[in-house]
């Protein structure tokens, strides 16, 4: 999980999800996991 100020979709399988005001990226590739902080 990478915590970044700007969350970007890296590949086709990345999905942007907003949960409780936190923007996340969920992907098949665990390296692509991100969270805005």
From Swiss-Prot:
Alphabetized GO MF terms: structural constituent of ribosome
Pfam families in UniProt: Ribosomal_L36
UniProtKB keywords = Ribonucleoprotein, Ribosomal protein
Is rRNA processing included in the keywords of this UniProt record? no
Name a biological process GO annotation.
translation
Q: Which family is it part of?
A: Belongs to the bacterial ribosomal protein bL36 family.
Q: What is this protein called?
A: Large ribosomal subunit protein bL36
Q: Which gene encodes it?
A: rpmJ
């Amino acid at each position: 999980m990478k915590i970044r100020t700007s969350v970007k979709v890296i590949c086709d399988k990345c999905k942007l999800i907003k949960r409780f005001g936190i923007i996340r990226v969920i992907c098949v590739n665990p390296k692509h996991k991100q969270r805005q902080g």
